[in-house]
């Protein structure tokens, strides 16, 4: 419109106004015109949508009419009606018109700008937009350009759906856009919250604003003052309400969950059409509203949900959510139910699905673009993310799998340097054939510069365990972030190794890569975001590790749990037991019952018990099976029964039942037979494995290729390198594990007890049976004497003239072997027949062997095999061996020296006169004592006599002794068929015996003696406390603590008179002449003819002889009457016997015949079977020291001479020794040293010599370097540790007594004995309730507790009770530990495999195999070395042939001796 025309129009309106108005209404006209102009301007400024459409517009006529109606108002008639007033009014009108014209011009300019901007937008112009805060046109928001593209401009409704759309809607098929579910981002959630608050605020303020506007309009129209004041008051209230609404908090503005909002406005304006209104509403009402519980679901809540949903039939989820009452929405309840519903869980991809996906991708792909969303239509039950994962990770033909080539690694490193370590989607394009997950894993786990490869040190392992405790299993990324230079996969692999997971088993059970089924839900796929590579790798790793984490959860808790759970004693009771034999102990029956063991008939060999599966041929009666013939692959029932020690009491029941039903005979295979088989198998296996390991790799060049062909040589070298790198590690690992398993088997076997197997005849028995003697003969022929530390120790101990020995060897090398002398007599036949009856006695740990068994000597192979390593049991009838036709064997140095000494002794005896022997003492049948050696004026021990220690036996308490490779043990007891033949018991060379007995190793071994003789030996440089405390102090060896008395025994041991002579001390002479047959001097053991010895009293002042004469009277029945009344026994010893039935191999043999032996009558304990005691066995015993207060304060000078302080063995005090001996202040005996010997005072002998002071060549004086014992020959430990070991400071501490109690041997406390004791637990508890009197006895539980309290109250200070309790705990502690161990093949959490290195461990493994080869010789028939009195029965010497220690606490000690690198064989104990 033109401005001039508008001005003209206004002018006309003014004239019309002047004509209408009279002079009195000019003020009112101006006021109304001004208000109308202001209202018009305000109306123009307000948005069109804010106007109230209900108010009709007011026309100018009505407005002027209203004004004319009010002209009679008296207040409007105040202006004068003159021309001057009219001129002034005209000037006012002109100013108003100018203002209106300026405003109109401004509006026209703005309109033109808006038109131009709109035209630019429609034309596609990108110019800057000018916004004045007004609402945008409908075509400027994003929703205008979305579907439907063609819609009505007024209603916004699009065209009707076509036929295709209607068909899809009828079938429920959604559009592609509806299938796309985009994850809500955080900024979108914040925007939704802000939008809801804004919409709510606008809904609350809109009525108030309209009300306020109406009040303002009405106020302007009223003329009454009262109405105006009322309207003003209402306006102020409306403004206050608006102000209160603006001050409402955000939580109040959010409203309820189901409140209605303008979702279309929020979708179009706030979200600009990116989210649909329905999607926004559902997300707000089901997930995002603050009233909805967004915390994790608890297990209790999930269980309640399952129950409530089942009650409602899995329908009406709104009611289910309300009934659940945890502020969960119905959608959340349904979603959680679907997650835990197994029927809705997606399964692995099938081959049909893989084939369909491959076909669809090939048909529908366009170049490199694959329309996964369209393919989803044809893949029922799968979403697009699953298709992407399956195709890109598994089915893509261009995807490479397996090892990475060096070229690929180089490309990967270049791509990482180019794009960084995050953008794996771009990096995969640089490495063709590899996915983003493969590239990421390869780089982070293998190629990263900060990764550390190789072995884990101890610090890293400790840190790994701490981090696993902190974060738990499965959080390997967090663990690796705090563990420097280690990746998550390395931590997982190390944890699996620590948990004992076998890699071979894992490789067999692990599925191939192409069969891995990727299954991820749509929500997880939508949550992956833009980082496709990282999300795929994390999903794949999580799915692969999920079963491993589930399996590893329990092992982790077992490994890292700081708590220790002690199960109830009732859980230890065996669940099953044999119906025919309810309980059978390995060492004898419990509760006084006879030993329930089925023995073969007399004359049959105990070796018949070898099982068929173990390839031990069952020998006929009288025959014997050689352990040499047992193949190395023996893993039959014998090893399994030994390994499955926790169920040893129940397993034989099935075999016995089957054997009884089949009518076959049952054989009780003793432990030593099982050990022989195992040792033979171990030796053969070790030899084979050692040779295979030492053999260099054979050339693999194929025939027909010349040696000069370079291609063939390179191929051969490549094959060798490949075989060396890949195969040697697994080979060494397998050898090492087999070696350790065999050692563990040998160590645990003695605690299993005897094995009962059916007697079956071997179907394929060779025509010519090679006996054990034949095998030993072959080994003796190959025996070589090597110089070893033990041989050096012998030479130092006995001061052997090596040069003279060599000369003697050279002189007698050509001589034929010496035949048995005419004085040799065969043992009585009844002694040979008595062995079968001894097999069933519980006192025997090892079986008797037939008389055809030949004496064995050590088989020395290699430089590390020790000379003088076996103890030997020789039979006096050498003609029996000659009849079988053995070839003559060369004699060893020890045999030649022994023969030389015997010949010299016989020559001297011819010139000697009768020997006078005084006093007689009563001791046990096989007790051998050690008197002290008096010192010479020069300070070195005089060549006095001594008697060797012999491990002694008690009723029902067999002991196991381990044979040492250096002659560490020799037996005193019965042989296989001749129980009356005694073999010499030499002192051990290991710290075991030094700690147990307090004695040092003995010298060479003497010939086998009968029970009527005492084997003695007197080296000049005695060792330890066994010969004299002074000798041990001189050599720096600590004295061992005294023995503790054992539990009482119901039957006293048979005793025989022992004639001892030591003229230096007071004696009481007897008138009974005693024959003496052996005398030990510095030159050796000398036989004395019986007629040449006369027993006469000797004055007390006469000088003592240099030799000690001792003999045992023939039978017990002949001497029982001469014993006289015996003093009451303070305590009968209950000690395990020595291993009487071993097959020792001595390092020195002699053909000197044994004197005639006499059969001893069987004790009553043997007759009834309750206590097994065999005459000839040795019993370590001593008296219980009576409590005394001044015994420790007494000086050594106050002690009586040694001859008056001899202990009483077997609970019998010598008849010639009074209760209180002279010189004992308190009349009681103090605790004695090893084997009951006191700390004896030193005595200086006079210049005179006794009748038996034989002439001998003077021995060379040892120098300072030869006088002291080299502790390095005893043990590889330090000198301080060896001396502590020798001091015997280990064992079970007995409270209130200040002493230690040695552990019991395995034969006494086997698993069978423990299981039998547990089977009688209820009966023992029932009997214990009889101790309680009164009303408490009626209640079983209260009676048991009352009886326990009674025992604690009355016996807590009783020494006998304390000893009995300590003995019981010492007996059954180790079997209880073994009962918790699983057998071979059963995985436990602590079964950590030993790790073997790659190249640096060949020497260690070879040394281990050599040790196993040396340990597994057939001559070694025992596996444990505990002996009564040893404070730690599990300790064994480094020079012995023991496999492993039986004490778990000493595994590390033995491990440091057998190998240089202990870290390669560390175990979690």
Swiss-Prot record:
Residues 1281-1393 are annotated as: SNAPC2-binding. GO terms for biological process: snRNA transcription by RNA polymerase II; snRNA transcription by RNA polymerase III. PROSITE patterns: HTH_MYB, MYB_LIKE. Residues 24-36, 519-541, 951-968 have a biased composition (Low complexity). Disulfide bonds: none annotated. Residues 317-341, 424-447, 476-499 bind DNA. GO terms for cellular component: nucleoplasm; nucleus; snRNA-activating protein complex. Residues 37-53 have a biased composition (Acidic residues). The modification Phosphoserine is found at residues 68, 599, 626, 1224, 1398, 1400, 1440. The modification Phosphothreonine is found at residue 1157. Residues 602-618, 1014-1029, 1436-1445 have a biased composition (Polar residues). Residues 1184-1195 have a biased composition (Basic and acidic residues). One of its GO terms (molecular function) is RNA polymerase III type 3 promoter sequence-specific DNA binding. Changing residue 199 to N: In NEDRSO; uncertain significance. Residues 250-288, 344-395 form the Myb-like domain. Residues 503-516 have a biased composition (Basic residues). Its main location: nucleus. PANTHER family: SNRNA-ACTIVATING PROTEIN COMPLEX SUBUNIT 4 (PTHR46621:SF1). Part of the SNAPc complex required for the transcription of both RNA polymerase II and III small-nuclear RNA genes. Binds to the proximal sequence element (PSE), a non-TATA-box basal promoter element common to these 2 types of genes. Recruits TBP and BRF2 to the U6 snRNA TATA box. This is snRNA-activating protein complex subunit 4. It comes from Homo sapiens. The gene is SNAPC4.
